[in-house]
Structure formats: C-alpha cells, structure tokens
Amino acid sequence: LPPFVTRDNTGIYRGTIDAYHSVMGYIRRSSQKYIIISGSHTVFNTTFHDMIAQHIRTGADITFMYNEVGIHHPDDQFNELRFNLAEDGRVTGIQLNPNQPATPHSSCDVVMMEKTTFEYLIEDAYSRGDTDFLRDVLLRKVGELKMYGWRYDGYVGCISSLPGYFNHNINV
C-alpha cells in the first residue's frame, strides 16, 4: 500500500478502518483479485501460494494464517488472536487477548480475502463510524462470513523490542 498520508488525509487516524479507507482509491485501481493484510511486527518466511489455494478450495470469504503455540508471552505488546476451529478448518470463534486461551491456534497477523470483500467491509464499517478492523469487523463477522484458518508450521516471531527484532531475524 502507499503511505496512508495523502493530500486529503494528514496521517491522523481514528483507527485501521480510517487508514484503509484513506487508500481505498489505490486498492480499487489494483487489478489483483485478492488482498493479503499482514502486520508489521510479525516475522515469518513463507509464500502465500498454499494459503491462496486453500482459500479458493474452501470457498472462504476470509482466511487467517495461524500457527500452533502454547502460551502468549505477557510482555508482548500486541493483540493476541486465538481461533476456535472446526475439523475442516472453519473458524467457529475468535478470542482477543484471552487470559486463559482455550485453543493453541494463534494468529500470525495475516488475513486474506477477495479485494471486493475487503472493499465492502471497509466501506460498510466506515459508514457506521467503526474504527478498528479487527474488533469492529472481523470479530463481529465470525458467524456471518465463511472464515477459515490456514496453518503455518514455520517459525513465527512477534517483534516487541529491539533485542526481539535481532533475535527473531536470526531465527527466521
């Protein structure tokens, strides 16, 4: 994506929905069918070919990349998302920052969907005054949209400090 700061938007946002909405013209002009959103603080090494193939095969509206972890480290400053998954990989529930996670399926902070789905979700949320894509859109749409998890078995690290940045880059 281009920088969120534009002639019409000075870079002060009310949240992720506002930020995505500010670059919607760029997104609409893109010829790509799919959009993949990834956080800037997560480190992993993968291509998305298998994730895209599963997304198409399952007919998912949204696919989340996840890995299997034990406990969340309390010193990590970013949101932790845990998924309840059916046997076929369909997301049946999402927990945000659970104190006692009920599942080992932890988000890698990557979400994929068709560009038209993303455009609709952002425009709809923006028109209602929603601010956070995770809380106001994804968490609320679990039973409404067809969401699946794609398991990633490689190394995943969450950068929350300068030493963490170096350690995760060495480990990747």
Task: Walk through the language-model features, giving the residues of each.
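Unchanged
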Residues: 1-170
